[in-house]
């Protein structure tokens, strides 16, 4: 989840007749199903091609206009990989113009310094990138493709150089639970503003056998709590 005082602030946005007293703070838009990767645990079951019924540009602009009529939330642009939409920066620019605060969750496989510049110029305030291992063999196993670990590190370096804040998301399964201390240390080293730890839920492509046991879940929660007391990171658990 996207949180943090540097993005969220209380009292912003107005009320709507139908939602009086309860303005939205977060809106997630699954912009496309398309993605170059085939992650084992992908909730969205992303494919190489976009879904034929995904929202067209004019449709999502109307949705943004409706949202902006009663509040100014963070707009989380997810996928698939949002960067596979040619109109994605036009949409994020429009969202910013209407007072929303766009953030993006790219796959990390299409980032260049030029893309970082376009993100910034179109109003993207932060990106969220997945990192599921502190070593290539762990991270790339989840992605089912060699080289993704190095691509992710390069993406984060481009973001750091471009002064685009980034958070790192990690999905915990039985395959990487013992690597959490190493992932934490790498996240700190990379300069992330936050580390969001997601406990795996068997949905999408994820199968039940990937989940940790209840005992392991409790141990992980205890470890994360203790780690968060001294870590320089904002650590969240979902």
PLM region spans:
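Radical SAM enzyme [4Fe-4S]-AdoMet core and its adjacent flexible, acidic
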Residues: 1-3, 7-8, 50, 55, ...
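Conserved alpha-helical substructure of the radical SAM core
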Residues: 2-122, 126
